[in-house]
Amino acid sequence: MWINLIKEFMQDLRKQKLRTSLTIIAICWGTIAVIALLAFGEGLNRQLLSGLRGGGNQIMMFYGGQTSQSFEGLDAGRRIRFAEEDVELFRRSIPQIESISAQYGRSVSLKSDYATTNTYMEGVDVPFEDMRTMYPVAGGRFLNARDVAEQRRVVFLGPAVAEQLFPDGNAIGNRLMIDNNPYTVVGVMQEKMQMAMSHGPDSRRAVIPHSTFRQTYNHAFLGSVLIRPVHPEYQKRIEHQVREIMARKYRFHHDDMQAIQVWDFIEAERIQAQIGLGIKIFLFSVGFFTLLIAGVGVANIMYVVVKERTREIGVKKAIGAKNRHIISQFIFEALFICMIGGSIGVLIAAGIVTGVQSLELQGGVADFLGNPVLSADAMIMTTGVLTMIGLAAGVFPARRAALVNPVESLRYE
C-alpha cells in the first residue's frame, strides 16, 4: 500500500514540478524560521538566566532598613541592622536554610608591585562562592573554612582587578596590600555574565573571610545576609521567619516591610521564566504563521491534484475503492510534501545554529543574546506543527475527492 502511495505521489510530483517545488521551499523556509527563532529565543533566555544567576544563584539577600511604624512605645525611623550573631540565630532557627553567609562591605585601596587601584571589598563566608557563582580559575581556590576560622589574610580577586594589579597574569600566590595590610591572593574568579549587581560587577571585586574583615575594620554590623533555601518553594516561609526573628529581637512590627529589605533572586528567576515563556510563544507564533502560509500552498496543490485526477478517482471507486482509501492517499501526499520540506528545513536550521555556535562570539550584543540552542522542545513543537498542517492541508481536499460521484467523474474531462 505504502509503495503504491509513494509511486502515485511521484507521478503527481512530475506533473506539478514547479508548484510542488515552490511549496516544499515554503515549508522548508517556515521550518527554518520556527527552529531558528526558537533556538535564538532559547539562547537568549538561558543567557538572561545566566546573567541573573551571576548576581545571585537562587538566593535572597536581606538588608537592614528603617522602621516605618511605631511599636511598643518606640518611634518609627529606627535603623535596623544585622549582626553576625543574627546569622547564627537564623542558622539554628530556620531548618529550611540550605546555606547562609554574612556579608560585610567597604571600599578599599589595593596595591601590588605593579599597580594601585580602588575597589569594593566584601567579607564573606565559604558558601558565598556558590551563592554568588564566584568560581575560581584553574590553579586557584575560593575561601575555605580554615581561612575563616584562623582569620587568615587571604583574598579572592575578580578578573578585572587581578589583571590590573598583576598584568603578567600571575596573581595567584602573590601578595598585595589592602589598606596597607598584606594579603595573599588564593584565587581569581572566572569570567561570568552578570546582569544584577551592587557596588559594581564582581569582576572588580575583592573578597576576604568575614572574620578577617571584622577583626581588621572592627565593623559591628553586616552589610547584608545571604540565604539560600533548600528548595525555592520555601522562599516566602524563610522571609517571613527572618522578619519574625528580627522583629522579636529588635522590637519592631513583623509586617513592617521597610525595617528589612529583601533582594529576592528566586522571585526574579520566576519572573524571568515567565518572560522567557512569553518570548518563546511570540517567536513560535511568528514561525507558525510562516508555516501556515506554506500549508495553504500544500492545500492548494492537493485541490489541483484532486481536480486533475477526478476521472481516475471515479474509476477507482467504480471498481470498489473505499472512501478511506481515497482519503488516505491524499492525506499521505500532503504529509509527504510537509515531511520533505520539513526535513530539509530542519537540516538547514541545525546547520545555521551549529555555525553560529562555532563562531563563539563574545562581547557587545553577543553577551546579551547568547548562543542559539537547539532544544528538544523546539524539535517536538516543529514536528507537531508540520504534522498538523499536513493533515489539515490533506483532509479537506481528500474529503472532496471521497465525495466524487463515480458516474459523473467518468464523464469528467
Where are these regions (language model features)?
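Short helix-coil transition/hinge motifs at the ends and kinks of transmembrane helices
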Residues: 68-76, 194-199, 251-257, 358-373
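Short cytosolic juxtamembrane segments of multi-pass membrane proteins
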Residues: 3-4, 398-413
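Mid-to-C-terminal secondary-structure elements
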Residues: 127-142, 152-253
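Peri-transmembrane interface segments
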Residues: 226, 242, 253-287
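Transmembrane alpha-helical interface segments in multi-pass membrane proteins
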Residues: 5-10, 14, 18-26, 33, ...
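Hydrophobic, regular-secondary-structure patches
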Residues: 42-120, 127-130, 145-146, 163-164, ...
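Alpha-helical membrane-interface segments at transmembrane helix boundaries
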Residues: 10, 14, 41-45, 49, ...
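Short juxtamembrane loops and helix-capping segments at transmembrane helix boundaries
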Residues: 53-55, 351-380
